Amino acid sequence: LHSKIEHFFNEKAGRLIQDSARRIGSPVPKGLSDWITQADFYNGYFLGPRDPRDSLMEQIVEAADRLDDFSVEMTLNKIHLEDELNAESQPDDCILVYFAVCDYFARYLLERGVTKPLLLWYSTDVHEPDVEFPSHTMSFGFPRSEKDYYYLDVESFRADAVVGTQISINP
């Protein structure tokens, strides 16, 4: 299943993300679509392009503590996107990509009879008040237990969205 999803995603990601974004009602900047198609799909985890590469393993270890064997994780770091996005791009663009990818995977899995995935958690990794480009992380998949269920409100198209509200993914 992993290899099939990896192949299919790498082939179709840009177009599907754009299509999903149009369903949500707002376009994804081309820079973000290009960026997402260069991301890594590693051992069942979907990981954004990363510098330094060592942080891939660190992220996988952290995710493995929380998530089931089949899960999807994506990290967007606005530092890495800085050169891709023009001055008119809004912070909401990052949030929009999360929903587009989540929407795509939910539809893809549902079409193939796989249990409906749920958005598990969302965080903004801002540790200092003067951080200019915080990282935004979302994960969805099959939670190990009820305590692992976290939801993000689909109305919270804001960089300051917080864990604890609800999102529904409709097929």
Task: Please state what every model-predicted region is.
Residues 96, 103-171:
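Acidic, proline/glycine-rich low-complexity IDRs
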Residues 53-54, 58-90, 144-171:
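Intrinsically disordered, low-complexity regulatory segments enriched in Ser/Thr/Pro
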Residues 3, 20, 26, 33, ...:
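Generic serine detector
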Residues 13, 21, 39, 63-64, ...:
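A sequence-composition feature that detects small, non-aromatic residues
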Residues 76-108, 113:
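Long, charged/polar, surface-exposed segments that mediate recognition or autoinhibition
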